[in-house]
């Protein structure tokens, strides 16, 4: 049951994520008392603090920004149910994709999202809603730091709201984290626009797609367009120390969850390392070589997409000439 979701991880990591129910169904059976007890026992046995070290991921169905009132109400009910499950388990953080405007006015969408959070906070006691930054595809909101800041501004109880930065999503949205100067600039902007006091978690993912692609395509650490240096910078940034950092990287079909264990060891190994460390440079080069073919494939797809988008513009220019 619930505890089986993290049996693969407890010997290797000190934070983890899970789903509270079937993430692709609106309604799921209530948590069984035996599962709740077992969850608490496992957390105690393996020294997890559920208030600060466990980050459940919200259902993919939930869209608090939906302009359709009936569908938005359905999303709110599912959202509140998730938060209540967190509190049954003693979990203090809950990760949420902000939502989509579905083509409606963006400012009204942000208000609807905040209204949904405010309603849920009134119905629950302590769990913090952690808004995740998004890649920027289509009408999804949350790819810009200003989106997250505006939602937070509209939330009444600001002690109950925070932010999770997903490295793949940030990169896909156009934030370059690959070298020190730009990495530092991103976090300076984050502190100015949102504020470190709201930073509650990190999702550690490399990116299969290029910078600014708006594609939410996670890759294993060091194999993608972000590369190893971005993660060296992250694990050595003092302001991020102590936050739950969750890997959402692809599983290897042969190794299964073991690939995550290897990535955890790699990230721990990077702590205290400098950018010019010969071992780090060699490891980075090896990982980039391993991921080169897949990067080339996605770069071509992205280039083809840009070229396709440019064709109507070229034809339109000719018509006006």
Predicted regions and their residues:
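Hydrophobic faces of well-ordered beta-strands that scaffold small-molecule active sites
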Residues: 1, 16-18, 52-58, 94-96, ...
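Active-site beta-loop-alpha junctions enriched in small/polar residues
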Residues: 1, 21-23, 59-61, 99-101, ...
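Short, acidic/polar
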Residues: 1-7, 74-83, 183-190
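Acidic (Asp/Glu)-rich catalytic clusters
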Residues: 6-13, 32-55, 80-90, 118-125, ...
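Structural motif corresponding to the early beta-alpha repeats
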Residues: 18-108, 245
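Alpha-helix N-cap and loop-to-helix initiation/capping positions
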Residues: 27-35, 66-78, 104-115, 139-147, ...
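Active-site acidic/histidine proton-transfer and metal-coordination neighborhood
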Residues: 64-162
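Histidine-acidic metal/acid-base catalytic patches
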Residues: 149-167, 171-321
């Amino acid at each position: 049951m619930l505890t089986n979701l993290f049996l693969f991880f407890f010997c290797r990591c000190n934070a983890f994520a899970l789903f509270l129910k079937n993430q692709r169904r609106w309604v799921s059976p209530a948590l069984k008392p035996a599962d709740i007890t077992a969850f608490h026992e496992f957390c105690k046995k393996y020294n997890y603090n559920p208030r600060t070290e466990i980050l459940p991921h919200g259902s993919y169905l939930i869209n608090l920004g939906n302009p359709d009132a009936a569908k938005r109400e359905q999303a709110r009910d599912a959202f509140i149910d998730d938060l209540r499950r967190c509190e049954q388990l003693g979990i203090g953080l809950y990760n949420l994709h902000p939502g989509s405007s579905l083509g409606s006015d963006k400012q009204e969408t942000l208000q609807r999202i905040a209204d949904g959070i405010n309603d849920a906070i009134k119905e629950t006691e302590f769990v913090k809603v952690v808004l995740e930054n998004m890649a920027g595809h289509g009408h999804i909101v949350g790819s810009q730091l200003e989106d997250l800041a505006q939602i937070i501004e509209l939330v009444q109880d600001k002690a109950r709201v925070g932010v999770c930065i997903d490295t793949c999503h940030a990169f896909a949205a156009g934030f370059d984290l690959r070298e020190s100067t730009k990495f530092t600039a991103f976090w300076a902007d984050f502190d100015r626009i949102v504020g470190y006091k709201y930073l509650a978690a990190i999702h550690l993912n490399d990116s299969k797609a290029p910078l600014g692609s708006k594609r939410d395509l996670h890759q294993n650490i060091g194999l993608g367009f972000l590369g190893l240096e971005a993660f060296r910078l992250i694990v050595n940034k003092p302001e991020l120390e102590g936050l739950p950092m969750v890997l959402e990287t692809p599983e290897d079909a042969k190794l299964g969850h073991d690939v995550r264990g290897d990535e955890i060891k790699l990230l721990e190994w990077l702590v205290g390392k400098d950018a010019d460390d010969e071992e780090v440079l060699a490891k980075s080069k090896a990982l980039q070589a391993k991921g080169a073919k897949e990067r080339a494939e996605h770069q071509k797809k992205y280039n083809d997409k840009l070229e396709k988008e440019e064709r109507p513009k070229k034809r339109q220019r000719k018509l006006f000439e």
